[in-house]
């Protein structure tokens, strides 16, 4: 072998060795230091989706070597349904010098981004397109401090209306319980979907749980056969209350997640929660291990699940079509 070739090979080998040794040292140091993880949600910290995201994320991080009480400190900031609190809560997390903020939903992510100066933000269950909302340059290359999970809630709500109409084939009127974050585009798509299905849809926007009963009363007075609950983290922990209000008024409900059907909604339809929760933890672990959020693609769910609660349907004296039940991933009897 020529001397120049030998030197080149040795030099390349040394560079590779230095790279892998450096990476190993970084990962070792990553697990030795104490990491600070912030959690920002517009809802309640321990209810519905937010609570489950927290639990699953901590389990995933523990599997990756980051454990509470050893090298991880967890900070929770929950707005309890009051969106006006999010900016101050985000500021508190930044002042606590967290290394990563998990933001449940677009509004929380925007508050975290405004409050921070480069703190990595992991979107968890963002309903709106992060590119259109200015949180990322593109899904493939976010280009900033925000990455994570996005699902097209606008289209998914339209699909829920289709499913509710299919489950209640004689129903001609439906209600839509919406959060204050309702966008014009979502309303337009739902209106078009309702027109295509030949049904009418009445929308009621509620600011807090105190407004639920009045909205359900209005739906009942309008003759609604069922109520579509808008996909929103604000509603994710309220399935038992929705079930009670709807059952008392003789109406079916379709909610955002399969677990909401288990908790009392007649139907639940949405992305596969188990996979999305674990993915949130995976993003955090990768950032702890040195990944740049600007280079971590924002992902969309590839699997959706439909759950039907026959116990609730029986209370409503509702016979769900056999063909419809055959499509369900889970039937609660």
Report each predicted region and the residues it spans.
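Short hydrophobic alpha-helices and adjacent helix-cap/hinge residues
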Residues: 1-333
């Amino acid at each position: 072998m020529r001397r120049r070739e030998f030197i080149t090979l040795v030099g390349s080998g040394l560079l590779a060795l230095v790279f892998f040794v450096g990476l190993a040292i970084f990962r070792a140091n990553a697990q030795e230091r104490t990491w600070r993880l912030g959690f920002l949600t517009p809802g309640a910290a321990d209810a519905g989706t937010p609570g489950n995201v927290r639990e699953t994320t901590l389990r995933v991080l523990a599997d990756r070597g980051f454990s509470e009480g050893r090298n991880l400190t967890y900070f929770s900031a929950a707005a309890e349904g009051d969106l006006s609190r999010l900016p101050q809560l985000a500021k508190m997390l930044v002042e606590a010098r967290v290394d990563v903020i998990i933001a449940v939903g677009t509004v929380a992510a925007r508050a975290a981004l405004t409050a921070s100066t480069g703190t990595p933000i992991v979107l968890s269950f963002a309903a709106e397109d992060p590119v259109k909302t200015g949180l990322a340059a593109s899904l493939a290359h976010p280009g900033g401090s925000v990455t994570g999970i996005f699902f097209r809630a606008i289209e998914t709500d339209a699909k829920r209306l289709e499913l509710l109409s299919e489950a209640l084939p004689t129903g001609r009127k439906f209600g839509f319980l919406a959060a204050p974050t309702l966008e014009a585009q979502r309303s337009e798509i739902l209106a078009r979907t309702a027109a295509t299905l030949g049904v009418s849809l009445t929308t009621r926007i509620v600011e807090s749980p105190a407004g639920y009963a009045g909205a359900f009363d209005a739906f009942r007075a309008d003759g609604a056969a069922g109520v579509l609950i808008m996909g929103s983290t604000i509603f994710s922990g309220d399935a038992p209350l929705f079930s009670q209000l709807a059952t008392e008024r003789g109406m079916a409900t379709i909610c955002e997640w399969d677990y909401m059907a288990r908790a009392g909604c007649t139907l639940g339809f949405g992305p596969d929660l188990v996979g999305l929760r674990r993915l949130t933890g995976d993003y955090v672990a990768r950032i702890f291990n040195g990944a740049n959020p600007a280079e971590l693609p924002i992902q969309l769910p590839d699997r959706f699940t439909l759950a039907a609660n026959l116990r609730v349907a029986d209370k409503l004296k509702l016979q769900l079509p056999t063909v419809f039940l055959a499509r369900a991933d889970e039937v609660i009897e």
